[in-house]
Amino acid sequence: ATVVAAGSHSLQIAKELGYGEDMSLLPVAGSFFIADDQLLNGKVYTLQMKKLPFAAVHGDAEVHDDSITRFGPTAKVVPGLERGRLSSVPDFFDVFGFTPEAFLSYANIMADRILLPFVLENLLYDLPVIGRKQFLPHVQKVVPSVELEDIERATGYGGIRPQIVDTANKSLDMGEAKIVGDDIIFNITPSPGASTCLKNAMRDTHTLLESLEGDYEFDEDAFREATIGHFPRADADDDTIAVDAVESAAADD
């Protein structure tokens, strides 16, 4: 039994093994801006547009240094499976497939009157000088007092979110994708963050145990205690907060 959790490359591997033939990817690179000040003590989201599968811009304190507040992500469509690696461009074309269905799917997606302006706008955010100015209004929705000189583009943050393209329906899937094959699972998750990765781990473990026909057991209580048992709680007597963080498999990462 095998779990393939290779990020953007999971679908590439799946295709090489004969799975996911009706799927392609729209790789989306996310960048962040930071403020060298503790402006927030939690995660604050702007309004999510229903038709956009990308996480809404949000602000939160940096995990390793709460004196820094980060805002993002942006969502720039790129022809590669890894951020900053030109060597992953051929990998993207492997996943793309060069089929009529793939070309028609991308054309249909990019012709959308909501998605196309969004994609074009996000191309500006990585540009010197004007990128910061263009992104500032999104930051001010979270913290209205922030000025242009308070933020700068962060380095070393962000990666690639592999958004699934359904080439059969010529559409962009709004969530994560999972291909379950013969004793193998391929995880293609746009945002395998803290809550989503733990939920995936529990779900995949149960699936794998079924294929192992009772030879092994999974102590889910011990798993929860070792992971979400350490999550901060608003009320020390309320265990449901941490559990809900995983059960939701949230899109908040």
Feature roles, as predicted:
Residues L40-V44, H64, V165-M174, P232-A242:
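Short, charged low-complexity intrinsically disordered segments located at boundaries
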Residues L212-A242:
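Active-site-proximal substrate-binding core of FAD-dependent oxidoreductases
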Residues A56, I114-L115, S248:
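Mid-to-C-terminal Rossmann-like scaffold of FAD/NAD(P)H-dependent oxidoreductases
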Residues A1-D91:
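Flavin-dependent oxidoreductases
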Residues E16, H138, V142, A226:
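Residues that form generic nucleotide/phosphate-binding pockets
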Residues V95-F218:
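C-terminal catalytic lobe of FAD-dependent flavoproteins
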Residues E247-D253:
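Long, low-complexity, intrinsically disordered segments
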